[in-house]
Amino acid sequence: MYSKIALTIGGSDSGGGAGIQADLRTFMALKVHGCSVITCITAQNSIDVTCVEPVEKNTLLIQLDTLFADFGIDALKTGMLLNERIIIDTASKLNTYKITKIIDPVMVTRTGSKLLEDSAINAYKKLLLPIADLVTPNIYEANLLSGLEIRSKEDIENSARKIIGLGAKAVLIKGGGLKDMKGKDFFLDLNGRKEWLFNNFINTKNTHGSGCTLSAAICGYKALGFELLDSIQKAKLFVEKSLDNSYKIGSGPGPLGHH
């Protein structure tokens, strides 16, 4: 039943809504066995993040080595890579793995606040984009990666071209950060194939972990053997249904219901 294996590399969300926890729930919903490598531990709830602690270098590398020594992992995704050191160490390992790599560049919050220092963003560009089979930035992250201010559909397409120029094989820019772009994402690959992808917009405030869920679902579908664009389309539908089943557990935005 769970013959395929997907790996998530990212941060632990103590509130259970995003990060590793959302990724593993997504993998389980897709009937894919989920493995995890923790890069940082957070203390958070629905309204605040009160602490973020990176794991030690050896702890990170041993987690990766131990998993790959025994499991035939079919696809992996990255989430929160907290600093330049973690990005460098992760990229050095990922460069040796000949499997699908989905890079979710968690750099900016949904409201536009930067999570990473410039040195870490530069490490993303130099080390992770060239080995990415797909990068899944939101509008703000695409801005940082491409250096282009994004205000329109045309800006999104130009930003995608810049990101492809940095070495990524494909990019999916999530348009939800722009007015009138809810549920609209832009896909571009190295061969010039481009698609605007549309889904129904689910009007809910319970969206915590939606970006993590999307990249995890893409990773899960790739592990199951689907082509990349098919995986993206299926993942978008999965997120739509999960948002429709979202629920409230605290004072702030609640998590998705992964079904």
Give the location of each predicted region.
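Phosphate-handling active-site elements
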Residues: 30-35, 194-195, 221-235
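Short glycine-enriched, charge-decorated loop/helix-capping segments at active-site entrances
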Residues: 48-54, 113-118, 147-151, 203
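Conserved N-terminal subdomain of the carbohydrate kinase-like
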Residues: 2-8, 20-110
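Charged C-terminal helix
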Residues: 54, 70, 229-259
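Conserved phosphate/ATP/ADP-binding segment of small-molecule kinases
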Residues: 118-194
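Glycine- and other small-residue-rich loops at beta-strand/loop junctions that grip anionic moieties
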Residues: 12, 78-79, 113, 207
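Short pre-catalytic strand/loop immediately N-terminal to key active-site residues, enriched for Gly-Thr
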Residues: 5, 9-15, 194-208
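Short, small-residue alpha-helix embedded
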Residues: 21, 26, 143-144, 204-228
